[in-house]
Amino acid sequence: PVILLSFKDFNGNSFEDSIQSLARILYSAAKDFAFLTENPALNEFDRNDFLKVLHVKGLPFHVQQTVLAEGLKILMQVLRSVYAKEVIVLVDEYDVPLNHARTAGYYNDLFPLLKEMLSGALKDNANLFKGVVTGCLRIAKESVFTDLNNFGSHSVSDTDLAAAVGCTRDE
């Protein structure tokens, strides 16, 4: 199973707006799997957690933050329970929320939430097979990924992955 979490359409001029935007993004990733709520492979606790993720847009602000922090990890647990396979997580444009937050002045509020959301899913998670993260900004030492192990960073000018993504000199 594969989860795509795209931050491409993130927007938010305030921390409160950013929470609403993250809720829409998480919901967009989870709704494709909504049919799994009735799957007998899910236990009651996973089902209830998954329902919170599916209803994240309508939750009170403080509850939304908690669900956002754990939502990706919950979705991975659900997929692992149903499909009995580790999950591939694709995170597209991870840096868009951080760039918005820095520009609008709420970076220090958003950073810990985004770090918990992504690190919780991508570090020490038995449900993860592989994670691929894309973004325009170079990953700095103090980023949402500082806690991750076995992390590689590649730019478009790197040639080591060129054949795998169709960017060889011949092409």
Feature-to-residue mapping (PLM):
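Phosphate-binding site recognition
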Residues: P1-E171
